[in-house]
């Protein structure tokens, strides 16, 4: 409190001196900022920037008050402060130099303010303090940038460790669970190489077997046997597998028409003619949902006995493969016709690869293959793979027609010299084709047909007799389809509707049993 009074008295003395008329050069030399250096608690008004002389103050301090304050405060310290301030100020005039009146501060309106200078000084001090602090930290506590780890980086590392630990724990528990003993005797018999037991090796074998099964479920065909066991009464010893896309049909999409499907020329004749010789199987990579509606239109009378879709194929090395070993048929009597060699890479000796059909309406490649397939059935070869191998690298229809023409020429020449030997026609045909027939199923003629001996005497070959019989059977089938085709389709639709109703009734009966209802009454026979 006393210090404030002392400062106030000192201020009053300085104010009184400055308010008096100019009398002393020493007082004129006092700069305008002297009160600021004399006391940090003083605030005054700033100087006028204009050169106009200040107006007279309306309120003048009394002389008695100035004298009283001057008596209380010694004059010498104030003069020392003023001298110090004049030395510190760079703009202060030299000693003895008179200051112009318009440059003096206007004290009639009060003491000039030093607020802006104080605030500017405080900011400079703060900035200087911050710079000093940063320099001190950089020098004293300096560390490498690589040692700094942000919060997000720490969180990421924590979650990474947590996830790795969880995965390791889950994998260990899964391995222990999958390595348990087999639950029934059927599984134990199916995995005889990994029997039950507590040893770690057997545990690992069982876990490996279960993991392999879980993966092969999506890679292997839906069933181990895609076709039922062959019927002994079914008089078709050979199986012919046909692809769908670009072999029997061609599908394309356009902006104008959307999806359109074209049927290959001669497909109906090809299917109906060979159905008397082969067990026809559709083996395609098209899914069931897409291929089944197409097959209903393509083969409404079900001459293709077994349709196999994408679900029956095998996924191997990133590609879809048609594995014939799952057909439940003797591979020596299986032929597959496809447009892509990679689809039949597991059994290439059983495959006939044709060029993809792209919609050409004059195409005859499929129909031209009928004589070769008919000849295989006629000669009853024990292994069709050897026959197909003999045409390796050649166009089968063209090469077969060439061999048949040579055989016919030789046969006719021998017929002229050996008319009494009718069996020579069969031997000449097989020898010229480079094939040896194992059984001649055409030697016994049905009722109403020409005897083979008579046919040979007329210059006909065995293959000619087989074609005549095949054409008669085909014409009979066409007649049956024309007369009874609609009836067959209606009967099939009625059977399907009855099966659907039966399935619906069975399902509703099951629901009634679950919810406590009565079972539907059984129909009396």
UniProtKB/Swiss-Prot annotation:
Region (Disordered): 35-150
Subunit structure: Component of the TIM23 complex, at least composed of TIM23, TIM17, TIM50 and TIM21. Interacts with preproteins in transit.
UniProt-listed GO biological process terms: protein transport
CDD domains cross-referenced by the UniProt entry: HAD_FCP1-like
Signal peptide: none
Name assigned to this protein: Mitochondrial import inner membrane translocase subunit TIM50
Protein role: Essential component of the TIM23 complex, a complex that mediates the translocation of transit peptide-containing proteins across the mitochondrial inner membrane. Required to direct preproteins in transit and direct them to the channel protein TIM23, and possibly facilitates transfer of the translocating proteins from the TOM complex to the TIM23 complex.
Residues in the Mitochondrial intermembrane compartment per record: 180-525
Membrane topology: Single-pass membrane protein
Domain FCP1 homology: 233-376
Bias kind Basic and acidic residues: ranges: 69-84, 136-147
Sorted UniProt keywords: Membrane, Mitochondrion, Mitochondrion inner membrane, Protein transport, Transit peptide, Translocation, Transmembrane, Transmembrane helix, Transport
Compartmental location: Mitochondrion inner membrane
Species name: Gibberella zeae (strain ATCC MYA-4620 / CBS 123657 / FGSC 9075 / NRRL 31084 / PH-1) (Wheat head blight fungus)
Topology, Mitochondrial matrix side: 46-161
Transmembrane helix among keywords: yes
Gene Ontology cellular component list: mitochondrial inner membrane
Taxonomic superkingdom: Eukaryota
Residue range of the transit peptide in the UniProt record, numbered on this chain: 1-45
Location, primary (coarse class): mitochondrion
SMART domains linked: CPDc (SM00577)
Family under the similarity heading: Belongs to the TIM50 family.
The gene coding this protein: TIM50
Transmembrane segments: 162-179
């Amino acid at each position: 409190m006393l210090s404030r009074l002392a400062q106030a008295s000192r201020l009053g003395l300085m104010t009184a001196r400055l308010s008096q008329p100019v009398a002393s050069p020493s007082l004129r030399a006092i700069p305008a900022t002297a009160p600021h250096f004399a006391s940090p608690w003083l605030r005054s008004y700033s100087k006028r920037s204009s050169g106009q002389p200040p107006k007279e103050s309306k309120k003048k301090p009394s002389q008695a008050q100035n004298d009283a304050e001057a008596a209380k405060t010694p004059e010498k310290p104030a003069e020392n402060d003023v001298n110090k301030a004049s030395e510190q100020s760079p703009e202060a005039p030299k000693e003895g130099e008179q200051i112009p009146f318009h440059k003096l501060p206007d004290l009639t309106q009060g003491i000039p303010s030093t607020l802006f200078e104080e605030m500017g000084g405080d900011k400079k001090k703060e900035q200087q303090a911050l710079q000093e602090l940063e320099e001190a930290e950089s020098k004293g506590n300096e560390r490498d940038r690589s040692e700094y780890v942000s919060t997000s980086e720490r969180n990421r590392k924590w979650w990474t460790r947590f996830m790795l630990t969880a995965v390791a724990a889950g994998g260990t528990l899964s391995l222990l669970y999958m390595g348990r003993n087999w639950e029934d005797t059927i599984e134990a018999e199916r995995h005889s190489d990994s029997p039950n037991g507590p040893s770690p090796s057997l545990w690992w074998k069982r876990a490996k077997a279960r993991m392999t099964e879980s993966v092969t479920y999506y890679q292997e065909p839906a069933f181990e046997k895609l076709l039922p066991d062959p019927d002994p009464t079914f008089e078709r010893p050979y199986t012919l597998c046909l692809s769908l896309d670009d072999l029997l049909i061609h599908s394309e999409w356009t902006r104008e028409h959307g999806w359109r499907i074209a049927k290959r020329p001669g497909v109906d004749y090809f299917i109906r003619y060979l159905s008397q010789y082969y067990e026809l199987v559709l083996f395609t990579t098209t899914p069931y949902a897409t291929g089944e509606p197409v097959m209903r239109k393509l083969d409404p009378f079900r001459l293709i006995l077994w349709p196999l879709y994408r679900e029956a194929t095998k996924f191997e090395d990133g590609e879809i493969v048609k594995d014939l070993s799952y057909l439940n048929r003797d591979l020596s009597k299986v032929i597959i016709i496809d447009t892509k060699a990679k689809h039949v890479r597991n059994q290439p000796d059983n495959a006939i690869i044709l060029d993809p059909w792209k919609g050409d309406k004059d195409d005859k490649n499929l129909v031209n293959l009928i004589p070769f397939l008919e000849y295989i059935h006629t000669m009853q070869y024990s292994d069709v793979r050897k026959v197909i191998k003999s045409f390796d690298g050649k166009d089968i229809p063209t090469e077969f027609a060439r061999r048949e023409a040579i055989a016919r020429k030789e046969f006719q020449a021998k017929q002229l010299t050996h008319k009494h030997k009718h069996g020579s026609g069969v031997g000449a045909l097989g020898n010229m084709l480079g094939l040896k027939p194992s059984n001649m199923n055409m030697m016994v003629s049905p009722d109403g047909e020409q005897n083979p001996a008579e046919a040979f005497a007329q210059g006909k070959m065995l293959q000619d007799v087989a074609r005549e019989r095949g054409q008669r059977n085909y014409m009979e089938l066409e007649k049956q389809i024309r007369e009874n085709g609609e009836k067959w389709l209606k009967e099939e639709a009625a059977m399907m509707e009855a099966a659907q109703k039966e399935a619906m009734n069975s399902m509703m009966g099951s629901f009634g049993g679950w919810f406590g209802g009565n079972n539907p009454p059984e129909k009396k026979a």
